[in-house]
Amino acid sequence: MNINKYIDHTLLKADSVQSQLDQLIEEAKAYDFASVCVNPCWVAYAAKALKGTDVKVCTVVGFPLGATTSATKAFETKDAIENGADEIDMVINIGLLKQGDYQAVEDDMRAVVEASGDKLVKVIIEACLLTDDEKVKACQLAVNAGVDFVKTSTGFSTGGATVSDVKLMRQTVGPDIGVKAAGGARSLEDALAFVEAGATRIGTSAGVTIMKGEVANGGY
């Protein structure tokens, strides 16, 4: 298994600066990670720096609360793609899901899918805020909306990915939709446990630590 190709090497902190982006990009090149996941303001910079490599540029939409309008999320998506994004990680409208407004949640996801063209869309369900029934419903709505991946977490709420959530999400979406475990992979052991549970992508700031077989303290 090439665990490096599962990793979205992530830097989403509000106070991240260009020197940290440069380090992230160089590490992603060195380890041939699947992508770098960066905030929208850094997409054009990352895309230019990674041109000619296999490393994709991933960014976030409606992040981290998911509470912007669908039109805003669609605009963010188009803007990110124009700037060079290959993959879009959007946050669902969690409040609408919890109050049972399922069609609105699905339509919100679909707005981003339609805005993305042929680019990859991952939807973040923020599993730490949901009951198991809500997690299942969110994944079902995501499949209906035509997304490419479901993703556990933003890394900015009360918890990150768990093995049990990854298993439940994989069981719900079946074999043809990706599952991204985000937040919580601090070591190679963690990463392998998520893959064993059904993850096909891992969002983490500890990608280098994982590749070295070490354990990270803190981070995403």
From Swiss-Prot:
Sequence similarity: Belongs to the DeoC/FbaB aldolase family. DeoC type 1 subfamily.
Function: Catalyzes a reversible aldol reaction between acetaldehyde and D-glyceraldehyde 3-phosphate to generate 2-deoxy-D-ribose 5-phosphate.
Alphabetized UniProt keyword annotations: Cytoplasm, Lyase, Schiff base
Gene Ontology CC annotations of this record: cytoplasm
Keyword Protease: no
Gene: deoC
Catalytic activity field: 2-deoxy-D-ribose 5-phosphate = D-glyceraldehyde 3-phosphate + acetaldehyde
Catalytic EC class: lyase
Pfam families, sorted: DeoC (PF01791)
SUPFAM superfamilies, A to Z: Aldolase
Recorded coiled-coil stretches: none
NCBIfam families noted in UniProt: deoC (TIGR00126)
Record's protein name: Deoxyribose-phosphate aldolase
One GO MF term: deoxyribose-phosphate aldolase activity
Catalytic residues of the enzyme: 89, 151, 180
Compartment annotation: Cytoplasm
EC number: 4.1.2.4
Pathway(s) annotated for this protein in UniProt: Carbohydrate degradation; 2-deoxy-D-ribose 1-phosphate degradation; D-glyceraldehyde 3-phosphate and acetaldehyde from 2-deoxy-alpha-D-ribose 1-phosphate: step 2/2
Gene Ontology biological process terms, A to Z: 2-deoxyribose 1-phosphate catabolic process; carbohydrate catabolic process; deoxyribonucleotide catabolic process
